[in-house]
Amino acid sequence: MANKLKVDELRLKLAERGLSTTGVKAVLVERLEEAIAEDTKKEESKSKRKRNSSNDTYESNKLIAIGEFRGMIVKELREEAIKRGLDTTGTKKDLLERLCNDANNVSNAPVKSSNGTDEAEDDNNGFEEEKKEEKIVTATKKGAAVLDQWIPDEIKSQYHVLQRGDDVYDAILNQTNVRDNNNKFFVLQVLESDSKKTYMVYTRWGRVGVKGQSKLDGPYDSWDRAIEIFTNKFNDKTKNYWSDRKEFIPHPKSYTWLEMDYGKEENDSPVNNDIPSSSSEVKPEQSKLDTRVAKFISLICNVSMMAQHMMEIGYNANKLPLGKISKSTISKGYEVLKRISEVIDRYDRTRLEELSGEFYTVIPHDFGFKKMSQFVIDTPQKLKQKIEMVEALGEIELATKLLSVDPGLQDDPLYYHYQQLNCGLTPVGNDSEEFSMVANYMENTHAKTHSGYTVEIAQLFRASRAVEADRFQQFSSSKNRMLLWHGSRLTNWAGILSQGLRIAPPEAPVTGYMFGKGVYFADMFSKSANYCYANTGANDGVLLLCEVALGDMNELLYSDYNADNLPPGKLSTKGVGKTAPNPSEAQTLEDGVVVPLGKPVERSCSKGMLLYNEYIVYNVEQIKMRYVIQVKFNYKH
């Protein structure tokens, strides 16, 4: 029943159906139940039509199947038995009897290449295939790689993806070409029987977001033949040799290989989208953690939430599972965006189309059957959105590695995940001076221009990262240390708390950062709160209050992408805004840290482009987390 699902589960189910995910739980339940009822009605109607027609064809199909079996030689009968998951021992008579009985039970013709069409015909941009509801399917993992979710169950039960040494014969290929309206995938796997006696080659292809067509070649008696077919197909589709894939070179109108992170080989296990189980399945009160901490960990370590957030911003987690994202894929995403940033001001439409296609090839998106021309990355705003997406994927890549041990194997998964963060969280009581100071700072610095929502503190924690305390020591008595806000997507917090705030990598485009690549802070709460990207349907947010050693600041009125090249003697950049907390109302803590919690006042000089101040440091050693604030957004409209 829909009402038994949790809110994040309801949103995920609705997103899978392409329905709105906004609203309170009661609204979500009603929306999902209506959709389920409509689906049931359609299925009943379809089944009724099928029954009326299938009764006439059942016997004829069965006779055709049995007739084909009788014309096969022993080797062909054995191959057919393997495909059906049947015993392959015995004489021709035994095999024939076994297959005929199976035909009587399921009434299907001999299993040949699924859908019967060779992939050379390609996907025709996917327009001839109806887009069906794609559900999250439980995939089967044996060893390093996950068997494709659409491989027949009888094959899954007996086969695994072949691995020889460091070579895992599993490839996901992607090709997006904006001008030709292509957004397609190609899956390629060598399957080895669990008995290691037979081998098959599985392929599936189509437009991103649909099941597509598939083909199963074999079985073969040795892996040599299967590997030959696999490597030839890989070369045919990508114009690269499988043996040289680590130095992969993309070619126009060819597929690109998406590198997967296989990690260490694990025991056979079913996995959901090949990402770790969600901690939200465990009730916080069942953990030995303080209930407040346990609730927070269940929020930020919720993989369903991560998948949902990424789906909402267009990422296709079914094509490149969140748990298998490699660092090289993220780097490639940044590299393409960097090249886009270099031509975006010239507005070279043809080049922007080419580069947008290259980005969507590396970072798969599900656009359904919309025209690809709608999704060209041709404005600074669109570029910024994609940079933020890749940043989020980078944080998720860290988080999924952090949570990679199946919490089901742990007595207390929430406690296990908390330990993995290596960040101490101490709850702060609502009646404490600290809580009052933070609440005051938050309330006073909520800008008038951000009046579409109010925010309340759900939980407040003192944060302690040992590594930060040690490296910050050199700045602990320096002048101009301030307590400043930093907000980020909910998907990012497992990575941030475990690794600290980090600076964008060299391959990221500098144009995505107004004052160069650094860590950005604000003295206005709502400016940072906007970077939580909460909404009416997902109104949880998390922010940091950090002690930041600013030293002498390089004050700028206008953006400067090269501001990270600080003038001699300067330790940080301040983007000067038109409105800022009243400095005369600031509070200084016992250790000398300044808290700019005064009510906003306007600057006498109106020059500049920023509404509010921004503070940027380019050395993470100048940052020390002080508080983690979990908040609830209450939207007025």
From Swiss-Prot:
Major localization listed first in the record, in broad terms: nucleus
Extent of Polar residues compositional bias: 106-117
GO molecular function, one term: NAD+ poly-ADP-ribosyltransferase activity
Motif annotated as Nuclear localization signal, chain positions: 41-62
Organism: Arabidopsis thaliana (Mouse-ear cress)
Any one GO BP annotation for this protein: protein poly-ADP-ribosylation
Lineage, highest ranks first: Eukaryota, Viridiplantae, Streptophyta, Embryophyta, Tracheophyta
Domain SAP: 2-36, 69-103
WGR domain residues: 158-255
E.C. code: 2.4.2.30, 2.4.2.-
Protein name: Poly [ADP-ribose] polymerase 2
One cellular-component annotation, GO: nucleus
Domain annotation PARP catalytic: ranges: 412-637
Keywords: ADP-ribosylation, DNA-binding, Glycosyltransferase, NAD, Nucleotidyltransferase, Nucleus, Repeat, Transferase
Induction cue: By ionising radiation (IR)-induced DNA damage, by dehydration and after cadmium exposure.
Biased composition (Acidic residues): 118-127
Region listing for Disordered, in residue ranges: 35-56, 106-134
Function comment: Involved in the base excision repair (BER) pathway, by catalyzing the poly(ADP-ribosyl)ation of a limited number of acceptor proteins involved in chromatin architecture and in DNA metabolism. This modification follows DNA damages and appears as an obligatory step in a detection/signaling pathway leading to the reparation of DNA strand breaks.
Composition-biased stretches (Basic and acidic residues): 35-46
Domain PARP alpha-helical: 286-404
Pfam families: PARP (PF00644), PARP_reg (PF02877), SAP (PF02037), WGR (PF05406)
DNA-binding positions: 1-140
Annotated catalysed reactions: NAD(+) + (ADP-D-ribosyl)n-acceptor = nicotinamide + (ADP-D-ribosyl)n+1-acceptor + H(+); L-aspartyl-[protein] + NAD(+) = 4-O-(ADP-D-ribosyl)-L-aspartyl-[protein] + nicotinamide; L-glutamyl-[protein] + NAD(+) = 5-O-(ADP-D-ribosyl)-L-glutamyl-[protein] + nicotinamide
Subcellular location: Nucleus
Keyword Nucleotidyltransferase: yes
Similarity field: Belongs to the ARTD/PARP family.
Highest rank taxon of the organism: Eukaryota
